Amino acid sequence: LIVWYKKAPKLKPFLSYLMVLIVFCELTLNMNVTGIPSTSGRKGYYEATKAYDQLNDITKKDADSQNVKYYRTESAVHTTRNDGARFNYNSISTFSSVLSANIQDYFDSMGLQTSYNACSYYGHTPLTASLFSIKYEYSTGEPSLPNNVSLLNSASYNLESGGNSTVYAYEYNNTLPLGFLINSSSIAKMNSEAGDPFTMQNNFVTSAVNGGQMIFHRLKTDGTNSITAQYNLEENDTANKSGTKVYDIYFYCETSAETLTATVSNGSIQDKSFVSSSVTTSTSKTFDSANQNYICHLGNVPEGATISISASDNTAISAMYAYAFDETAWEYDYNLLNANPYQVTSFSDTKIEGTLTTDKGNLLYTSIPYDKGWSVY
């Protein structure tokens, strides 16, 4: 068409019309093939939004009853990284071309999922969820960390394809405020002893407050593909863990694989079910987007069980770290971290006000990312 357009001036009007028609037809075909089937219809979108609005009202009333002015909410499974914006709740997951590299570095160090221009709630632990003031989690099924939440409420909506779906609102048992005091030497210790994400989190709780205890205890592994539900404590881990019968297992793999699959032998994964009011039992669990290297939560596994980690397409796993979470130590550390909270009295998109009582020599740790234009007074 372009050749004819250049060589036949008399046909230019007709050829211009023909090119516009071809482009229009192609756009229409693309929309029908790739656009319409992959997105929610208007009715389904509207119904889902109403359900989330109901839960937003419920969680706000619950937070108000506890005099909590600021908190964050997350989804156990994302539709997009910007679900918070879509459903009108404050979250830490975001997709943005102007995302700060420093925020990504922090997420990476703590084992949270990141990509080139996005960061995510995936990879969270009870500590990191609490550090980001995540008080509620929405899920269309079970919560991501069943040992650490309680069921608050639910809302149902009609699906466009027929039937209905239910969204559950879970409340974390321990949520730190937007800011709290830590020892002034804590940041330097974390940076000087940086390692895998579990080491980073242990370093934080043991250095941020006097008397802090390690919340992750190392397990036996072959370093790449196999985990045994038995302790292999580090030299500086003095916890007495004898008699442990069930291990709440987390692991982290360095790999370029798209998918990781954890398979349990000599036992099974047994987690509390809030939806069916029973215990869910399985022998395998799959983790997607594993090439973005984040902490994977396996769940409760009995002592002595063996967990095999396999990567998709026979991709190599260059390193693997596996730890069991210590709920008792976390309860103890949480109370220490929450001893000197920043009490938010009011907030908006441009201003946060609150009160804090402090002695000299402490740092105010907040989950407010630094950005030019913000000031403290």
Give each language-model segment a name.
Residues 16-362, 367-374:
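Soluble catalytic regions of membrane-associated enzymes that act on cell-envelope
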Residues 1-3:
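Membrane-embedded alpha-helical segments of integral membrane proteins
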Residues 5-20:
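Membrane-interfacial entry segments at the cytosolic side of transmembrane helices
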